[in-house]
Regions:
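Conserved phosphate-binding loops in N-terminal lobes of ATP-dependent enzymes
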Residues: 4-62, 69
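Short, hydrophobic/aromatic-rich segments at coil-to-beta transitions
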Residues: 1-5, 123
Length: 160
């Protein structure tokens, strides 16, 4: 069975877990969101490379307009330093693992569609309220990214 390390990056905390390919959470933890890009990547790389389990990849759930294909983040979010660098290149080089990344609201919606309250639903509207506010739209079982990767985002809002 394949295992993955998944990071859910938020404006306040980064939650991470070792997850099996069937969605079972093997273990989980969190740490405070770093204040700069160097610490951001250092935390992810150290936790990945020091993992006891054999990993098949890294999954990143990130705020902003996440370009899953090119490995970058546009737009704005509670963590302004994450916009610009190529996450896939940096993390693959440092860990020798495949990296997948997606917008955090899209990840939450996909998780609920896979194993949660929206299981077996084809059309979903999902709202996330945390340090920021975001949303996701799943239409006919697929994430609607929109022309500029803002398909489910109804505004740029940061909450206190």
């Amino acid at each position: 069975m394949k295992n993955y390390i998944s990071f859910d990056v938020g404006g306040t905390d980064v939650k991470y877990a070792i997850i099996s390919e069937t969605g079972d959470i093997l273990r989980k933890d969190f740490y405070k969101s770093p204040n700069n890009l160097d610490d951001f990547f250092r935390e992810i790389i150290e936790r990945t490379n020091n993992c006891e389990e054999k990993l098949s990849g890294i999954a990143l759930s990130l705020p902003g307009a996440v370009d899953s294909v090119n490995g970058t983040i546009g737009g704005s979010s509670a963590l302004d330093y994450i916009h610009g660098p190529n996450f896939k290149e940096i993390l693959t080089e440092a860990t020798d693992l495949d990296v997948e990344m997606e917008n955090d609201a899209n990840c939450a919606a996909l998780a609920e569609a896979w194993l949660g309250v929206a299981k077996d639903k084809k059309d979903i509207l999902f709202i996330v309220i945390g340090t920021g506010v975001g949303g996701a739209v799943i239409k006919d079982g697929k994430i609607h990214h929109g022309t500029n990767l803002h398909g489910g985002e109804f505004g740029y809002m940061i909450s206190d």
